């Protein structure tokens, strides 16, 4: 009988086309249709944290004597495949294309609007 090993998590970074500070729209899930700014990217897990999306409530115990416990709400991560870059000018979500400029630099461009992001 073959010996099975537990599934290992990959530690390889995944190239993401969504960066911190981008405006994105959620395309699936309970927060579908919401837009927000990317607060943080997690490239190893291929996830992003978006402002105002996937809100979780956490109960925090008091750390010092005399302090009371509290309830904290915070954004949890969303898989990067569940969000699309959003154009604030045209109010539309779009896929991303990488464009190589004449000087050799790479820019991101929205496919639907042709708008350059970087």
Swiss-Prot record:
Please describe what this protein does: One of two assembly initiator proteins, it binds directly to the 5'-end of the 23S rRNA, where it nucleates assembly of the 50S subunit.
Q: What organism does the record attribute this protein to? A: Prochlorococcus marinus (strain MIT 9303)
PANTHER family, sorted: MITOCHONDRIAL RIBOSOMAL PROTEIN L24 (PTHR12903)
Q: InterPro entries from the entry? A: KOW, Rib_uL2_dom2, Ribosomal_uL24, Ribosomal_uL24_CS, Ribosomal_uL24_KOW, Translation_prot_SH3-like_sf
Listed Pfam families: KOW, ribosomal_L24
Q: Which GO terms describe its cellular component?
A: ribonucleoprotein complex; ribosome
Query: HAMAP family, per this entry?
Result: Ribosomal_uL24_B
Assembly? Part of the 50S ribosomal subunit.
Highest taxon of the source?
A: Bacteria
Protein name according to UniProt: Large ribosomal subunit protein uL24
Give the GO molecular function terms: rRNA binding; structural constituent of ribosome
Disulphide bonds in the chain: none
Q: Which CDD domains match?
A: KOW_RPL26
Task: State the similarity comment.
Answer: Belongs to the universal ribosomal protein uL24 family.
Q: Which GO terms describe its biological process?
A: translation
- What keywords is this UniProt entry annotated with? Ribonucleoprotein, Ribosomal protein, RNA-binding, rRNA-binding
